[in-house]
């Protein structure tokens, strides 16, 4: 009988040691989790505002726009629809440019949100979240590797805090833009000249 080869699996965590060490690292862990939670909360609120952009571009009601929004099952598909409808419906270059900018800003934030939602989190022996590893394959030099690893250091936490601030600004800018988009589209609405 041949010897069994060594396991290729990572060693499981020492759960008892982590549980014992967890209280001492709770503040740091809570800080990281609060940043991630705030980012996801802000991102979701901003994505939902695109329902109103769709409502205006489709010249429909809120429920119908939400149905279209929910039927498209990826953020990219939703933003693509917004951009295509804008090309068909928005004639004012300033309004179109502002919408393009809002979509671009949201898309940049979507990458960070996806990175944090679709990763493995590494904790050290004290229970501190030290790294993230993306849950996707990357090709480098013709070789596939499993997801990029990034530290959860002070610079990364500052990046998250800045992204949250940007989401706050984006939220205000989206709310400010919606009435301008509505006014532009109302001005372009064809006049019904059919007999009564």
Language-model features and meaning:
Residues 2-41, 48-196:
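Acidic, Ser/Thr/Gly/Pro-rich intrinsically disordered interaction regions
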């Amino acid at each position: 009988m041949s010897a069994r080869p060594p396991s290729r699996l990572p060693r499981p965590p020492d759960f008892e040691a982590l549980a014992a060490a967890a209280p001492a690292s709770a503040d740091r862990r809570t800080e990281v989790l609060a940043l991630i939670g705030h980012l996801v909360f802000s991102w979701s609120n901003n994505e939902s505002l695109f329902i109103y952009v769709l409502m205006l571009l489709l010249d429909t009601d809120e429920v119908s726009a939400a149905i279209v929004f929910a039927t498209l099952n990826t953020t990219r598909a939703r933003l693509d629809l917004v951009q295509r409808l804008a090309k068909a419906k928005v004639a004012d270059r300033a309004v179109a440019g502002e919408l393009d900018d809002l979509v671009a800003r949201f898309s940049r934030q979507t990458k960070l949100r996806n990175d944090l939602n679709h990763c493995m989190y590494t904790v050290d022996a004290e229970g501190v979240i030290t790294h993230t590893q993306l849950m996707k394959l990357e090709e480098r030099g013709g070789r596939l590797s499993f997801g990029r690893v990034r530290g959860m250091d002070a610079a990364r936490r500052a990046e998250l805090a800045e992204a949250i601030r940007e989401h706050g600004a984006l939220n205000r800018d989206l709310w400010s833009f919606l009435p301008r988009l509505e006014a532009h589209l109302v001005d372009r609405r064809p006049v019904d000249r059919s007999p009564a």
